[in-house]
Amino acid sequence: MAGHDDEEARIETVKDAVTDMKLERQSSTESVAPNGILDTITPKDEPNGHLSSKPSTPSLKPPKSRSRSSNSLAKDEVPEEKVGGDITIKQEPGQPPKLARSASQKLPPRAAPLFTDLPDKTTEATSTFQLMEVCTYANKYLGYTEHAMDCDCAEEWDAATCRNTACGEDSDCINRATKMECFGDCGCGDSCQNQRFQRREYAKVSVIKTEKKGYGLRADCDLRPNEFIFEYIGEVINEPQFRRRMIQYDEEGIKHFYFMSLNKGEFVDATKKGNLGRFCNHSCNPNCYVDKWVVGEKLRMGIFAERYIKAGEELVFNYNVDRYGADPQPCYCGEPNCTGFIGGKTQTERATKLSHATIEALGIDDPDGWDTAVARRPRKKKAGEDDEEYVDSLQPKSLDENGVTKVMAALMQCKEKWIAVKLLGRIQRCEDERVRHRVVRMHGYQILNSQLNTWKDDFNVVLQILDILDKFPRLTRNKIIDSKIEGTVSPLQECDDERVAEKAKALLEIWSALEVGYRIPRMKRDPAAVNNTPTANHYERRETAKDDRKPNSSKSRSRSRSRSRSVDVTRNAPRGPAALTRGGGKGHMHSYRPGQRPFRRPFNPLPKGWFAAESNGRTYYYSATGETTWSRPTAPAVQPPPPPKRESKEKTLQDIIDGIMNAKENTPKAKDKSATPATPADAKIPEKKEHKEKWRSYSEEKQKKLYENTLFPHVKYIVDKFKHKLPKDDLKRYAKEVAKKLVNSDFKNNRVEDPTKISDKQVKQVKKYCKEYFDKAVAKHRAYEEKKAERKSKGSVKATTSATIDKAETTSTKAPPQFDGAAETGDEDSDVQLSDAEYEDGQEESSHHSGLKRKRTDDEDFENDHENGGVSPTKRQRSASLPIIPPPPPPMSPSNLVLDDGSREALKRQRTEGAEDDEYGDSTISSGKRQRSETPPPPPPPPPPADIPPENIESENENDKDQEELQDYDVQEANWGKEDNIAIQSPSHSPFPAQSISNHSNTARETDSHS
């Protein structure tokens, strides 16, 4: 007890000696920490003057003995005062008091005080500001950082706790090691342990009222080291706004502000809006630290436990502040190593202070050695001097595997060039291949890609990064592609610095030679369909009964973790099969309800293409082609031919339209059937009275379009006559040109009374003009072909001129010269001169001998179509293309139960004939659908093997065959006169009815006339 009393007396003496000292005021300019990591915070709104600052990592531990310093200042130069026991205070003019470096013993640690007796002031404290759950950003670019990367962890579900233990504190999660939260579709699954910021997994804390420090934060439960306590939330602002608010709050009488430095030039202001994290006080011996984490695309700040914290302890961290102004703020932490003031020196006079994590990443052996080495320099730091000069004399230790995590985490958040250079230098000097593999695994390519984009204007830093990339172990291109670093290195090939250009070019050549390793693609999860409740599934992994009987066993607990979600332990899994093995009997089977059993292949299945059906209790077998048999087949069935490829809807519709137009034009007039059929007059469709004059409300452009559509059938009538004389593309172009000329001329001369119809006289004039137009085009085309043939004949010595011309006319594929209708008939704006003379079709047909035969054949076909039911041209073409199928052979002998090859072929032809008859009678699609179905409908069973005598069956089959041949012969004889251009194999082999044969022959004649 006496020793304890002496210790308390000693601490009180130190506290009194520190607080009674007077420091000379010194003026200093306001500035921001140049390194962007040290945080500037101003005091809190309580008389304690405690600051709310933002250190970026764990605060410093209690300093070790500094008696090892060999360059300590002489004692006679600096006055010292012994305030109690072995503790000595050193005082310098104008400087805050500090412990003497000559102390030979470490300060004795003290037990952390508990504040369990203080009442909860959370409600009272939250009334002084606006409570927020997330940070607000002045603009969307504030707090932005590189997107979080995917980790390599897999799901690990613990059945006992029903939690996903992946990415935990003790795991080797890459994201957790580099201070990134798993975000989106990481492979670790839903609700992993590395989503604390997103799920707001705050510790149980409460606000208390302290004696001297005002409001403080108290832990209501025990906390483990590195446990997440609270996120520091407020308004994220930029530096100009920060400076304006400093002045604004001072004018409003707010003496204590809550600013935390989030990034270089970015601050979190929790003065008026924030959460309970703003009440965490300062201490020179803290139990918490502040760290920055990447969450999605934002950088966020959280408070974490630095050591084991008991319930009732006050949560404090080292503000590590750079003071703005000359007035030092007193510190009331009461720790043995307390310097008495928060921040100490002003911004321009301070010594270099870095976060604990940054010091470890730089390779400094002892965090205290950093401050000691800086303080022992023979001169003070000058205003505006870079911190880099203070660390040049320090030799960092070599990088090992354990230090890679700290280096990559610090490099990920580094915004200061001199710190980035030091960290990159540690990686560059490393020669251990295992360490380099570790760097690559810790998102090495992604982090170096970010640094390369940040410092691409500094060629020295770029060379340093390229040298590190060149030393990386390379097996595949996967990580290089995922990091997208090739897009950053590629522009460096055009760099002004030759060293950078050569290095970048060589690196890209090496990368391009690597192969891409195949990886199983990760399943993309739908964020909206996330369900955190484990559900029972018949195929999921179940826990064994042994694990259920030993819930407290560590061995069974370790086995209960699996890669996938396990069955909910609160539900009773079916135990039917297990009950039978234990002698449960039928009683246990009553509650066993298995799920749907998997499909099992039937025993001794039929060969491919065969199916079974029943008839009168007997089983027979059939194939898709119609082959049937009573005996079980042993060989695969002959597969039916694939269904014909269906035409597209657009082509089918166009064929229907063309068929209607051809039938309309080929319709002869009733008054002169004997004469050569003239061009059909325009079909007058009766319209409703109210729609008769609707076209008058249209614009002139729309009326022209309507009139052009009216002329189109008559222009097409002439175009069809020239389709074998001109190339298709030229024919279409000329048709459009002549239609435009006719429309413009008629509208210019006011010859259009109604754009929806034209008179018979106009029809003849239009056709005459179109014929003259295309005759000139044909003449031009032939002249062009002749000239081309002459040029070919000159180049060929052996070929004759006549042979060259014939060959050019038949095999030429070049486009003919552009036919300028305006050059022959006048300008486009000039009127089209239409004569009143009637256009005689006989003149045209006399000049084209083959056209007369085709026209007469078309008229006959049209009449036959109307007499026989109006079969469209499309159907006629389909009929012509189908092969003629011979009739089926007589049925097989019932005495032969096993079909031979001839019988099978006969049944196949018989079945195919039935399908063709259905197709021509109904639709061409039905048979295709039957062929595509998996199991076709069973055909009628084959004749019974023994019920009917064979003699009767053979006689009936012969009579049926004779009758079918007689009917087919009658049909063939009735249409014999029309089939002059196509040969039919045999009357008895024709499966087509009379109508189909007639259409078939007409189509053949039409094809022959065209040729």
From Swiss-Prot:
Compositionally biased spans, kind Acidic residues: 825-844, 953-971
Start and end residues of each Post-SET domain: 327-343
This protein's record includes keyword Transmembrane helix: no
A single GO molecular function term of this UniProt record: histone H3K36 trimethyltransferase activity
Enzyme class, first EC level, given as a word: transferase
Positions of the WW domain: 604-635
Pro residues: bias regions: 884-893, 935-948
Region called Disordered, residue ranges: 1-118, 527-604, 630-650, 665-697, 782-1011
UniProt-annotated location(s): Nucleus; Chromosome
Reactions catalysed, as given in the entry: L-lysyl(36)-[histone H3] + 3 S-adenosyl-L-methionine = N(6),N(6),N(6)-trimethyl-L-lysyl(36)-[histone H3] + 3 S-adenosyl-L-homocysteine + 3 H(+)
Every SET domain range: 203-320
Start-end of Basic and acidic residues biased regions: 10-27, 74-84, 538-551, 684-697, 782-793, 901-914
Pfam families tied to this protein: AWS (PF17907), Med26 (PF08711), SET (PF00856), SRI (PF08236)
Main localization category: nucleus
GO biological process, one term: regulation of DNA-templated transcription
Residues covered by the AWS domain: 146-201
EC number(s) stated in the UniProt entry for this protein: 2.1.1.359
Sorted UniProt keywords: Chromosome, Methyltransferase, Nucleus, Repressor, S-adenosyl-L-methionine, Transcription, Transcription regulation, Transferase
InterPro entries membership: AWS_dom (IPR006560), Post-SET_dom (IPR003616), Set2_fungi (IPR025788), SET2_Histone-Lys_MeTrsfase (IPR050777), SET_dom (IPR001214), SET_dom_sf (IPR046341), SETD2/Set2_SET (IPR044437), SRI (IPR013257)
Domain notes: The AWS and SET domains are necessary for transcription repression.
Family statement: Belongs to the class V-like SAM-binding methyltransferase superfamily. Histone-lysine methyltransferase family. SET2 subfamily.
Known role: Histone methyltransferase that trimethylates histone H3 'Lys-36' forming H3K36me3. Involved in transcription elongation as well as in transcription repression.
Stated name of the protein: Histone-lysine N-methyltransferase, H3 lysine-36 specific
Organism whose genome encodes this protein: Coccidioides immitis (strain RS) (Valley fever fungus)
Gene that this sequence comes from: SET2
